[in-house]
Structures are given as structure tokens and as C-alpha cells.
């Protein structure tokens, strides 16, 4: 499951994000991170903060807590793992509304995948914390280097 998550997440930046940008006729809005361009101390500070607040914090809230609750809520629904994963992904995407429509869609898709992986893996949070941290590290570095 961790390998599948890694492969899919690895495709987000080069394939999925541009496709969603084209389909929504928008681009994810990272304008609030403009000061990172060429600013290594700021980028490294944000990476450290992202590992604590997003990788660990968001995975605890959105996977360990929310997915547990949603899975229980859909207890009588056939295919509840899918409903819980999609609902969790929707909530996760909407929590990233500051990124615009494209950002909501991509983040929601990743959130649904992470929720599904969490439930299917016997609720193993650590591979998702690692994946989330790597995604955020890559994102900060692309902003620092001016690639996005």
C-alpha cells in the first residue's frame, strides 16, 4: 500500500496537477508563498514547520481521527471504505480552499487516496506522515526554486 501511495503521489506534480489545472481552467494558487523564492532560510523553516503541522498534524486530524469517525458513520453502508475515503478527501480538499479550485481538487484526490490507504493498511499512519512530509517538502522546494 505504501508503494502504491508513493507511486500515485509521485505522479501528482508532473501529471495530475497539470491535468486538473487544464480541466478546471485554473491553476493552484500558491501566491502567498512568494517570499520563498530564493530564500533558503525561509524555505527550510517552512519545511520544518510543514513536517510538524501538516505531515504529523493533518494526518492525525484527517486520517487518524476523521477517517475513523467516517468509517464508523458509514458502518451500515456497503462499500463504506469508499464513501469514507471520498468524504474525507472532500473535507481535506475544502480545507485547502486557499489554493483555489485546482488546489482543492488535487488536494481532495490525494486526501481520498490517503484515507483509503489508511483504512486498507490497518490504519498505519506512519507511511502517510512520511508521504505527506515528502509532498510538502517537494512543494516548498519547487516554490523556493521558482519551478511553480
Model segments located where?
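Functionally important transmembrane alpha-helices
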Residues: 101-148
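Juxtamembrane helix-loop-helix connectors linking adjacent transmembrane helices
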Residues: 1-54, 72-77
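Aromatic-enriched alpha-helical transmembrane segments of multi-pass intramembrane proteins
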Residues: 36-41, 78-87, 123, 138, ...
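Hydrophobic, membrane-inserted alpha-helices
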Residues: 47, 85-95, 110-114
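Membrane-interface helix caps and helix-loop-helix hairpins in membrane proteins
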Residues: 94-102
